[in-house]
Amino acid sequence: MIDKSAFIHPTAIVEDGAVLGANVHIGPFCIVGPQVEIGEGTVLKSHVVVNGQTKIGRDNEIYQFASIGEVNQDLKYAGEPTRVEIGDRNRIRESVTIHRGTVQGGGLTKVGSDNLLMINAHVAHDCTVGNRCILANNATLAGHVSIDDFAIIGGMTAVHQFCIIGAHVMVGGCSGVAQDVPPYVIAQGNHATPFGVNIEGLKRRGFSREGIVAIRNAYKLLYRSGKTLDDAKLEIAELAEKHPEVKAFTEFFERSTRGPIR
């Protein structure tokens, strides 16, 4: 179904079965597949390809040569009906690629809302990107990566499959991330190592001074105390009982499968 207010350029191809909401704009030479749903106010600039079982929310801007919902690069993939879901108000810049999921990984690649994916960023199969994240130019997420809210991934940075990047993390450019990055941490290098707490980012997002001090204390327990990882986790859990901001660390430890960067 195509809303009567949607615009489709004469050179674009929108296949039968696609759903376009109100005021959707499909620019020149775009291709929209038959199982695609695009929400109200979303704009495809030009030469954008949206394929597969892909659902895109409202008021997104998708720039030229982006490819969304295409077959993933997992050699085990055999054409199963897997999906891509994208939220609202994202800016997806030129040549970004977002691949559909795999059955083995849950069948869904998901991008939240209010994100900026810069030129040539790649989101592989079964990744989850939260809200208000930034993937800078040429940032690359391997399969099954999870990026939590407000994280920033620097340009030319590659993230290993199954890694978790915690909320409010900043990963510097040209880095290689092979383990999980705890929330609030600045990481840099190949392999990425911790360089402190993202204090400026936390201030900009309204964290209190007391909360930031508690986060820094948790960071010190994890990285500066000389304690074993298990002992540091126990003390951080005690700290989290008094400071809710620190609970993000304990939740991260429960999810982590590759272990925190060291």
Curated annotation (Swiss-Prot):
Domain of life per record: Bacteria
Alphabetized Pfam families for the sequence: Acetyltransf_11, Hexapep
Primary site of residence: cytoplasm
A biological process from GO: lipid A biosynthetic process
Subcellular location: Cytoplasm
Keyword terms of this UniProt record: Acyltransferase, Cytoplasm, Lipid A biosynthesis, Lipid biosynthesis, Lipid metabolism, Repeat, Transferase
Catalytic activity entry: a (3R)-hydroxyacyl-[ACP] + UDP-N-acetyl-alpha-D-glucosamine = a UDP-3-O-[(3R)-3-hydroxyacyl]-N-acetyl-alpha-D-glucosamine + holo-[ACP]
The enzyme's E.C. designation: 2.3.1.129
Metabolic or biological pathway, per its Swiss-Prot or TrEMBL entry: Glycolipid biosynthesis; lipid IV(A) biosynthesis; lipid IV(A) from (3R)-3-hydroxytetradecanoyl-[acyl-carrier-protein] and UDP-N-acetyl-alpha-D-glucosamine: step 1/6
A GO molecular-function annotation: acyl-[acyl-carrier-protein]-UDP-N-acetylglucosamine O-acyltransferase activity
GO CC entries: cytoplasm; membrane
InterPro entries attached to this UniProt entry: Acetyltransf_C, Acetyltransf_C_sf, Hexapep, Hexapep_transf_CS, Lipid_A_LpxA, Trimer_LpxA-like_sf
Enzyme class, first EC level, given as a word: transferase
Similarity field: Belongs to the transferase hexapeptide repeat family. LpxA subfamily.
NCBIfam families xref list: lipid_A_lpxA, PRK05289.1
Subunit (UniProt): Homotrimer.
Record function comment: Involved in the biosynthesis of lipid A, a phosphorylated glycolipid that anchors the lipopolysaccharide to the outer membrane of the cell.
Protein name, entry field: Acyl-[acyl-carrier-protein]--UDP-N-acetylglucosamine O-acyltransferase
Organism of this sequence: Salmonella arizonae (strain ATCC BAA-731 / CDC346-86 / RSK2980)
